[in-house]
């Protein structure tokens, strides 16, 4: 069965933890996972630098799948970015436009920041701008625009509903079972 809890009871047998809570709760849950040597998928966003550093440090002890977005479509978008180095350069302008529901707390979203970091890892020094909009009940939309000389390329990922995140999280949790310590991403799942 599946148990949903803010704390992990000491007597509960746990194979893997999936966390989509808040940065503070995620760090508490991560500490419990580390203490009990349980793999964890962290889907929470909005972490501070010191929290990200702690996640990185604890990944030396336990397997951590850090996934600000668990959808397959964003994994595809990141893969396209990774394979675009023959077409683009740091001289191009990259623009990310995102739309999320009005209740979303972090802005820009973890997904937008993840896309930005992906671009900068391929094109160090590139100019990457982000516009964030929060309105209505939109589960998430990210549009990447790449400006060339007198032309623009746009790639859009639109979540039709939130079930895609649950499906990706389940896939990630199953994949994480049996993995050794390390900091993993959704890219690792789709490349294995």
Feature map (PLM): residue ranges:
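C-terminal substrate-binding/catalytic lobe of Rossmann-fold NAD(P)-dependent oxidoreductases
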Residues: 1-11, 24, 89-192
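N-terminal Rossmann-like NAD(P) cofactor-binding module of classical short-chain dehydrogenase/reductase
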Residues: 17-18
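Rossmann-fold NAD(P)-binding glycine/threonine-rich loop
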Residues: 24-31, 35-36, 43-66, 72-84
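Short glycine/serine/threonine-biased micro-segments
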Residues: 41-44, 71, 108, 138
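Glycine/charged-rich beta-loop-alpha catalytic/anionic-binding loops adjacent to active sites
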Residues: 59-67, 148-155
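Short, surface-exposed loop/turn motifs that are enriched in glycine and acidic residues
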Residues: 66-74, 101-108
